């Protein structure tokens, strides 16, 4: 059903928004928050009719009085009519001004400059500054004033000011107001999260369930990022989320628990309850999510199912066969024993939960994972929790938006639409969203862009906080001197899941002396914008599996910003921890001596892959360390196996020259790759 905003109806009725809001509450018992609230057209028409009838009644009474007065004194009436006409014209003008809602203006953040509010008020700078002076505030054109001051200033000019994020909230409420009555709801598939300690066999269990090999393709057999998969059993679908088991990825596990219906807690029969198992249990209890325990590795010689059940009772989980209500299923991912029993228990539990959704409403759900793909742009894995998402739909995701250009299911097949409980990979977003962000389908891309822009502006304003410079090496001294009360970190990684994990782990390091705050986290190479943000907020930049580009390196050297890069997530955490405790004593420092761009690639059967490269900065030296960087992400790290200038071996090749090179144990060099050459330089130990 169509709706109309309060301010629009006020204009039609020729009254102010405030008057209409009061009227709605007192006479019609309709509660509205502000002028941007929407009411049904049916209610609006009723209000118009009632007010119209009231006006007619008053008008008839006035006309009767006028006839009586005219009969008594026709000359006086003639003069009064002239005055009355002028008065009516004047009143009409005032009412017209009121109908424009006293000139309602909006603010997108907590502060606004004098120049901006002058433009919004359509007043000269001098008038606004004069009013501020009368209020006891001395402000220049570019100076900012807070919302309270702006509100008082607007009132001086008979204007009303509102924060735009309230409007945004109402916009989304209107967009998402769909009928959720029982007749519209249909049964949906359960969403299952698999949790547990590292090496207890979560991925192997999923592998056994899906009857496909994914464990062998992942480094070290450990799932590094959340994946979503759908399997079918007896014609019924089940959606699985696979969350990593490392303690550092607590945030990713917590995110999984928020979108799941049932948790499968994997516990190794030969290992029992471990730290990550305890954390998983805590997340399930906090989210009030039903839990099924899969006791894995029952084929191992040291397996003890009863011992696991005994340990579970310490956390309030009593097995059904022990008189409790926790479902425990012994399984073996290796021999496939108990897999069917586990799936049956999942379907049985989902039937008890009576999971339902409305597939005919606008889609909404959660971002499971997001990344930047070289050929396809921003790619996001979405889990649809309600409604149906189609190719061509416009969506808003956190502070980004887009129109879906293509959609793929978990098998990689191109699909046109997807309903509740379905994981999909989509293309078409303007930027890479945050993992865990909610997404909402909106009517058109313009609406999505508007909401995303408001959110982005708010986030940007929160970033720009500044203090003084700090580096990791002298952090402890500055803490002791009291010059550092807050350590700001900018975290960049190759995928969003790693950003979130680092953020969660780093912020836990806060102490009474210094608070650790991740002021920004993003996906992709470290760029100049990150350095600018670090400069403004006195931050340190941490890179995980990514490298800074040339502009970022130049800017960091110019502004004195510390950039640290890591391949292992725990090294980053330990470095910050050690620096804060005053135990950071580096023995070697990495020095980048040069970079080269691969212009051409030659494959020689007896030798391997040879790259023809152009030295962009510094120099390349034989036997020095070398990294292969593709799209800002470190692909491989080793050392230069050979370095030639024409046909001759060269010890080093300087900037501006071309050379031929090969990387030790690496043959997948491609045109456009950047080769970064570095040496490890010994430095004196520091006592911080």
UniProtKB/Swiss-Prot annotation:
InterPro entries: EF-G-like_DII (IPR053905), IF2_II (IPR044145), IF2_N (IPR006847), P-loop_NTPase (IPR027417), Small_GTP-bd (IPR005225), T_Tr_GTP-bd_dom (IPR000795), TF_IF2_bacterial-like (IPR000178), TIF_IF2 (IPR015760). It is found in: Cytoplasm. Residues 296-299 are annotated as: G4. Transmembrane segments: none annotated. Residues 196-203 are annotated as: G1. Residues 53-100 are annotated as: Disordered. Residues 242-245 are annotated as: G3. One of the essential components for the initiation of protein synthesis. Protects formylmethionyl-tRNA from spontaneous hydrolysis and promotes its binding to the 30S ribosomal subunits. Also involved in the hydrolysis of GTP during the formation of the 70S ribosomal complex. This is Translation initiation factor IF-2. It comes from Clostridium botulinum (strain Kyoto / Type A2).
